[in-house]
């Protein structure tokens, strides 16, 4: 293909140029990864999108970041894999089917077509030949193969679990979909039901998943902490408490003569004032059978919030039973047993003892039910008679008090001493306690009572039980002839689809009608991208070459579930020989959101397109375009349709071009922080685009025939030094994801070049050669961020190659060495002036130069120097 540049005499037209270069890249297959390429491999991946209908600015920022990394690494000589796909199963497609009378498949693939076109408009350097959607039969066929592999490996379990059941929608709801006890969509009161569900045994990997976090040095510390807390390893004791009843002939107490509590703080046992059991504890269930009031209390608790966060923030409620627990260190002390709404059955044993003086939850409960609050930990340095628990519990360290044989010990020492004593005591012929390790992480329930998901390849036979679909009979394909006129899962009603012969005995059987959680789909897609057409789920040779993903990019909202499940999947696949790594993602970057001002009139939210903003008396005021009525300018918030502060990327690209959008969205804020979208910011970015083009258009007739070269002396040498220093700094910025810093340097660089380019015909030949090299550097540096403009300028300078295929320029380190630098000088912490020193100056030389400064000498007349604090290349502080 002949590469032609745009007419130099015209204003840069991004729409025409961007379409042209995208067509050239497609025709030349510039970004199609060649597996056999022996160069060092680099895999960059952004979390793939859900095809909701249209991309938003959050997508643009996410994929622009990944594209900068991909283009930069490609220029640095790596064989880059940068794929794209679609996380396509899920509830929104079923909602659309019900609301719009359209099949989920039709809705999904229509959205994919639209969003693919939008992403291509951005000029992403994606290998589209590897594209797939998780709803493609080819993809979920391989996912079913993985399920069977997991099943054979013992990593799949089928067991009864308590779920949130929406009686109107007739489906299970995730905890997050229960709002104030009601279904998020139907508004129906949610019921707690026990259903038989399919689980992946992620808990088998708890210790390994926790230990692996230490190796993820290129992950944000915040994400690692969140996963560590979610896995929730704790070391404690299982303590057996003898039970007694306050009522004679208590049949329940005869059946339950003891209860086991898990505690990480046995050192606080002498401060215990109650035992609390989960509403789902077997003892609570037994007591409720004979107590209607307790039965009502339990049902009321179950209708409230179900998430851990909701239980922690909800008002603490308890029901006092007829039972008391005998204190393990003092049989004369009996403490009441409650059924409480804040105790979780799926953590520990579903029973805890409460020490109100040293735990906020226990303190709140004790205050509500007028229970004793006995302090047993005294803060260090505080007299015992001066210490009391009044308004809040004491949560810190110290020494033990009011604790018999533990007095005077630290809590850590008391833990060991209490454990030793309890392990030596006997209750009903067994030690009263044993040390144990517990994890918060529970097995992953993957069953969903929905149609639009990957079918679980299992068959229910009345004779053989539950048996797997033979691998040769896969895939189990979703039927197309379903309707959504009634709530619930249409697969349950599809007799033709679910009726099947048992693969073991041949008798009549039924298919499993649950489908897999959509998090399963995204737990292994990164491995599939390495060989998307392999017959097996993944190709071991390909995964060995490409995994782990060197750089993964996405929102921090996926810090726990998606990222944890992907880590589990990689370990599981390694155990089956599919991959050779433990971790899927070597580097992780979590970008901030795109936010925008909100606008509101007396009735509703108003979109940015409906208003104009003017300055009045130094203040910004907003007015409706239709009737000039005043609009309130609200807070800056995440873009959302509900608040109408969404900006459509298509509109901005149509007005300014993709490069302007990419440049602005990466320039205005550090990438880990939120970026505030402003029209003025976009206009500023577009002015820069036009300025770059003007500089090239003016200088191209001269520079296209100039051989680039480093300046040898004078102004030409100084320009070359600036060019090489900028190249060196921008390279470092891109390695560190500091895109905004790189862009700031490029603004400065153009400011230095522009005056020289504007009078290019009048400069010396040496300067022309230095300018040509500087411009080549500049275009190479903007190319990852504004690829279309860089290509157009590169062609305008007479080049017949694609800048997207060029190597990154080589920096001459000798030209980057600063000969001198300037330091701010403080006297007693207040800046008084500056000092310029040689780049090689020692601290002694810096001190000598500072003492020779006139403004320093003036202060030395009154006071001598006590010390001088020198932070090299940062600051000097003279302390008098």
Curated annotation (Swiss-Prot):
<dbReference type="Pfam" id="PF00133">
    <property type="entry name" value="tRNA-synt_1"/>
</dbReference>
<keyword id="KW-0030">Aminoacyl-tRNA synthetase</keyword>
<dbReference type="Pfam" id="PF08264">
    <property type="entry name" value="Anticodon_1"/>
</dbReference>
<dbReference type="InterPro" id="IPR013155">
    <property type="entry name" value="M/V/L/I-tRNA-synth_anticd-bd"/>
</dbReference>
<dbReference type="Pfam" id="PF13603">
    <property type="entry name" value="tRNA-synt_1_2"/>
</dbReference>
<dbReference type="InterPro" id="IPR001412">
    <property type="entry name" value="aa-tRNA-synth_I_CS"/>
</dbReference>
<dbReference type="InterPro" id="IPR015413">
    <property type="entry name" value="Methionyl/Leucyl_tRNA_Synth"/>
</dbReference>
<feature type="short sequence motif" description="'KMSKS' region">
    <location>
        <begin position="638"/>
        <end position="642"/>
    </location>
</feature>
<dbReference type="InterPro" id="IPR002302">
    <property type="entry name" value="Leu-tRNA-ligase"/>
</dbReference>
<dbReference type="InterPro" id="IPR014729">
    <property type="entry name" value="Rossmann-like_a/b/a_fold"/>
</dbReference>
<protein>
    <recommendedName>
        <fullName>Leucine--tRNA ligase</fullName>
        <ecNumber>6.1.1.4</ecNumber>
    </recommendedName>
</protein>
<dbReference type="InterPro" id="IPR025709">
    <property type="entry name" value="Leu_tRNA-synth_edit"/>
</dbReference>
<dbReference type="Pfam" id="PF09334">
    <property type="entry name" value="tRNA-synt_1g"/>
</dbReference>
<keyword id="KW-0436">Ligase</keyword>
<dbReference type="GO" id="GO:0004823">
    <property type="term" value="F:leucine-tRNA ligase activity"/>
</dbReference>
<feature type="short sequence motif" description="'HIGH' region">
    <location>
        <begin position="49"/>
        <end position="59"/>
    </location>
</feature>
<dbReference type="GO" id="GO:0005524">
    <property type="term" value="F:ATP binding"/>
</dbReference>
<dbReference type="GO" id="GO:0006429">
    <property type="term" value="P:leucyl-tRNA aminoacylation"/>
</dbReference>
<keyword id="KW-0067">ATP-binding</keyword>
<dbReference type="InterPro" id="IPR009008">
    <property type="entry name" value="Val/Leu/Ile-tRNA-synth_edit"/>
</dbReference>
<dbReference type="GO" id="GO:0005829">
    <property type="term" value="C:cytosol"/>
</dbReference>
<dbReference type="InterPro" id="IPR002300">
    <property type="entry name" value="aa-tRNA-synth_Ia"/>
</dbReference>
<keyword id="KW-0963">Cytoplasm</keyword>
<dbReference type="InterPro" id="IPR009080">
    <property type="entry name" value="tRNAsynth_Ia_anticodon-bd"/>
</dbReference>
<comment type="similarity">
    <text>Belongs to the class-I aminoacyl-tRNA synthetase family.</text>
</comment>
<keyword id="KW-0648">Protein biosynthesis</keyword>
<dbReference type="GO" id="GO:0002161">
    <property type="term" value="F:aminoacyl-tRNA deacylase activity"/>
</dbReference>
<feature type="binding site">
    <location>
        <position position="641"/>
    </location>
    <ligand>
        <name>ATP</name>
    </ligand>
</feature>
<keyword id="KW-0547">Nucleotide-binding</keyword>
